[in-house]
C-alpha cells in the first residue's frame, strides 16, 4: 500500500469519527429539553444591564430599573449583571428558597473584586466548610450569654461617649457620629483598642479609605478609590499582625492582660487558623461589624423626625425604664431593660425594613434548578433582592411609609398572602439560612441602646431636607445626614 493510500485511509477514519461525534452532539442537544428561562433581556455585550441596575436611587424605593423590570417581566426575570447571565428575584418565596438551600442548590458568589479587597478568607466570600468554621468563631464570640454579660455594657459605654460629646444647638453629620460609635465599639471588642487613642484614630482613618474602595469600581491603578483601598488594606493588615505578634509574645511569657477579653485573644487561644486567615477574619469583621450598623442607626435618626407620634411613644417607653432605674439606684442598662423596649424593637424592625441596608445578595446556581415553572441554569448568577420584598405593597401596607406599629402583635403582617402570616417568612434584613448574619442580635442591640440615650437626652431636627438616604447600591447619605441637636432631660 502506497503512502498516499495510507494517508487517504487515515484522513477518512478521522473524518468519520469526527462526523459521528458531531452527530452525537446534535442528537444530545435535540434530546435535551429547551430551558424555560424567566422573561427579560441581556442588554449590552459584557456589561449587560449592570449600569442601569447600579444607578443611584432613593433608598426607600426600588429605583427606576427594578420598578420597570418588575412591571414588564414580573418578580422573577433574567438579565446580564456584573458580567454574567443572572436571574433576579423580587419574589419572597424564591428568595427564601435560595437562602435555605445554600450549599445545596446555590452558593455565595460575590464579584472577584470584593474578595480582592476583603481577602480570600473573608466570611463574605467564603463558602462551604470554611465559611461554617469562620461563622462558628463569630457566633461563639457573639453568643447570647456574651451579649447579656459583656457586650450590653460595652454598647452603652460607647453610646454615652459619643452622645455626651455633642454640644448644645450644634449641627453635625449624624452618620459620622454613628460610624464613630460602631467603629470604636468593634475596635475594642475585636482588639481592645481604646477610643481616642492615636493608634485607634489612625486605624479609623485607614478604614475610611478602605471602605471607599470596597464600594467603588474595581479599577486598580494609581489614584483610584480601589487602588487607595488596597494600599489601606495593607496598612490595616500590618497593624493587626503587629497586635497579633504582641499577644503571642505575651502569651508565651505568661504576661497576658486579663482586660484583653477580645476576639483576637479568643481566636489565638481557641482556633487553628493561620495568620492569613486570622487577618482576613478580623478585617472583615471590622467591616461587617461597624459599617452596616452605623448606617442603620443613621436611618433611624433620619426616619423618626418624620413620625412625631413614634418619638412620643419612644419617650414614654424610655422614661419609664429610666425612672425605674433611678428608683432602684441603678445607672447601667440591664438585659431586662433591653427586653422592655418593645416599641423600640418595632422602630428597629421598621428602620431595617424601609432602609434596606443590604438590598440584594450575590448567589450562583450549583445545579439546574426549576422554580414556579422557570429554569435557573447551573452556573448562572442569582440575585435575591431583599429590598423588593420589604417594599412590596402586597406584603406590607403602604410600604414606603415609616410605620413602626405594623410590627406590634408579634410582628404579624396582615397583608402577607401565604400559608403563614408571620413576618419571619418575608422579613430578612440579615439574610437567612446558613449564612444568616452572625452579628444580627448585636446590631439590634446597638440600635436600641443608641435610641434609648438619644431619646432621653436630645431633641434633633434634620437641617437639610434634600440630604436623603440613597442606594448606590450601598446606602449612604450624600451630605452625612446633617442634624441640629438640643439637649433635654426626661428624668
Swiss-Prot record:
Effect recorded for residue 284 to G: Mimicking CYP90B50, increased cholesterol 16S,22S-dihydroxylase activity and production of furostanol-type steroid
Chief site of localization: membrane
Subcellular location(s) of the protein: Membrane
Transmembrane segments: 6-26
GO molecular function: heme binding; iron ion binding; monooxygenase activity; oxidoreductase activity, acting on paired donors, with incorporation or reduction of molecular oxygen
Effect of residue 155 to S: Mimicking CYP90B50, increased cholesterol 16S,22S-dihydroxylase activity and production of furostanol-type steroid
Effect caused by changing residue 65 to Y: Mimicking CYP90B50, increased cholesterol 16S,22S-dihydroxylase activity and production of furostanol-type steroid
GO biological process entries: brassinosteroid biosynthetic process; brassinosteroid homeostasis; cholesterol metabolic process; steroid biosynthetic process
Pfam families recorded: p450 (PF00067)
Chain residues that bind heme: 437
PROSITE patterns attached to this UniProt entry: CYTOCHROME_P450
EC top class named in words: oxidoreductase
EC number: 1.14.14.-
Effect ascribed to mutating residue 288 to G: Mimicking CYP90B50, increased cholesterol 16S,22S-dihydroxylase activity and production of furostanol-type steroid
Keyword RNA-binding assigned: no
GO CC annotation, single: membrane
Mode of membrane association: Single-pass membrane protein
Pathway in which this enzyme or protein is active: Steroid metabolism; cholesterol metabolism
Keywords: Brassinosteroid biosynthesis, Cholesterol metabolism, Heme, Iron, Lipid biosynthesis, Lipid metabolism, Membrane, Metal-binding, Monooxygenase, Oxidoreductase, Steroid biosynthesis, Steroid metabolism, Sterol metabolism, Transmembrane, Transmembrane helix
Catalyzed reaction equations: cholesterol + reduced [NADPH--hemoprotein reductase] + O2 = (22S)-22-hydroxycholesterol + oxidized [NADPH--hemoprotein reductase] + H2O + H(+)
InterPro entries in the cross-refs: Cyt_P450, Cyt_P450_CS, Cyt_P450_E_grp-I, Cyt_P450_sf
Function text: Canonical brassinosteroid (BR)-biosynthetic enzyme capable of converting cholesterol to 22S-hydroxycholesterol via sterol-C22 hydroxylation.
PANTHER family for the chain: CYTOCHROME P450 26, STEROID (22S)-HYDROXYLASE
Protein name: Cholesterol 22-monohydroxylase CYP90B51
Species of origin: Trigonella foenum-graecum
Lineage: Eukaryota, Viridiplantae, Streptophyta, Embryophyta, Tracheophyta
Gene transcribed to yield this protein: CYP90B51
Amino acid at each position: 500500500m502506497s503512502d498516499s493510500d495510507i494517508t487517504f485511509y487515515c484522513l477518512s477514519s478521522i473524518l468519520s469519527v469526527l462526523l459521528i461525534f458531531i452527530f452525537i452532539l446534535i442528537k444530545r442537544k435535540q434530546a435535551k429539553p429547551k430551558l424555560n428561562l424567566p422573561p427579560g433581556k441581556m442588554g449590552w455585550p459584557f456589561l449587560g444591564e449592570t449600569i442601569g441596575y447600579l444607578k443611584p436611587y432613593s433608598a426607600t424605593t426600588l429605583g427606576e430599573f427594578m420598578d420597570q423590570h418588575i412591571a414588564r417581566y414580573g418578580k422573577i426575570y433574567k438579565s446580564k449583571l456584573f458580567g454574567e447571565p443572572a436571574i433576579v428575584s423580587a419574589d419572597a418565596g424564591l428568595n427564601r428558597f435560595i437562602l435555605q438551600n445554600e450549599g445545596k442548590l446555590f452558593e455565595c458568589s460575590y464579584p472577584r473584586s470584593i474578595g480582592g479587597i476583603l481577602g480570600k478568607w473573608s466570611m463574605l466570600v467564603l463558602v462551604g466548610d470554611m465559611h461554617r468554621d469562620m461563622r462558628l468563631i463569630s457566633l461563639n464570640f457573639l453568643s447570647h450569654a456574651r451579649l447579656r454579660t459583656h457586650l450590653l455594657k460595652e454598647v452603652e459605654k460607647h453610646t454615652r461617649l459619643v452622645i455626651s460629646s455633642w454640644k448644645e444647638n450644634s449641627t453635625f453629620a449624624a452618620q459620622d457620629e454613628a460610624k464613630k460609635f460602631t467603629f470604636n465599639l468593634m475596635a475594642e471588642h475585636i482588639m481592645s483598642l481604646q477610643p481616642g487613642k492615636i493608634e485607634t484614630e489612625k486605624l479609623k482613618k485607614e478604614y475610611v479609605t478602605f471602605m471607599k474602595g470596597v464600594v467603588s469600581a474595581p479599577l486598580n491603578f494609581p489614584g483610584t478609590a480601589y487602588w487607595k483601598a488596597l494600599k489601606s488594606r495593607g496598612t490595616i493588615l500590618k497593624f493587626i499582625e503587629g497586635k497579633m505578634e504582641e499577644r503571642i509574645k505575651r502569651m508565651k511569657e505568661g504576661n497576658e492582660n486579663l482586660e484583653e477579653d477580645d476576639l483576637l485573644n479568643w481566636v489565638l487561644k481557641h482556633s487553628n487558623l493561620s495568620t492569613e486567615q486570622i487577618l482576613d477574619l478580623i478585617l472583615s469583621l471590622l467591616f461587617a461589624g461597624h459599617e452596616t450598623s452605623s448606617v442603620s442607626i443613621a436611618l433611624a435618626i433620619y426616619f423618626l423626625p418624620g413620625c412625631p407620634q413614634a418619638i412620643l411613644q419612644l419617650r414614654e417607653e424610655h422614661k419609664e425604664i429610666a425612672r425605674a432605674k433611678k428608683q432602684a439606684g441603678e445607672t447601667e442598662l440591664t438585659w431586662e431593660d433591653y427586653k422592655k423596649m418593645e416599641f423600640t424593637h418595632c422602630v428597629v424592625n421598621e428602620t431595617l425594613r424601609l432602609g434596606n441596608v443590604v438590598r440584594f445578595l450575590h448567589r450562583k446556581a450549583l445545579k439546574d434548578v426549576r422554580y414556579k415553572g422557570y429554569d435557573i441554569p447551573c452556573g448562572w448568577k442569582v440575585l435575591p433582592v431583599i429590598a423588593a420584598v420589604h417594599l412590596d405593597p402586597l406584603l406590607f401596607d403602604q410600604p414606603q411609609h415609616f410605620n413602626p406599629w405594623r410590627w406590634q402583635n408579634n410582628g404579624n403582617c396582615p397583608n402577607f398572602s401565604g400559608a403563614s402570616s408571620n413576618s419571619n417568612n418575608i422579613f430578612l434584613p440579615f439574610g437567612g439560612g446558613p449564612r444568616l448574619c452572625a452579628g444580627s442580635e448585636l446590631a439590634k442591640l446597638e440600635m436600641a441602646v443608641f435610641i434609648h440615650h438619644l431619646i432621653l437626652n436630645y431633641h434633633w431636627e434634620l437641617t437639610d431636607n434634600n440630604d436623603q438616604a440613597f442606594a448606590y447600591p450601598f446606602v449612604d447619605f450624600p451630605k452625612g445626614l446633617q442634624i441640629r441637636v438640643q439637649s433635654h432631660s426626661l428624668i
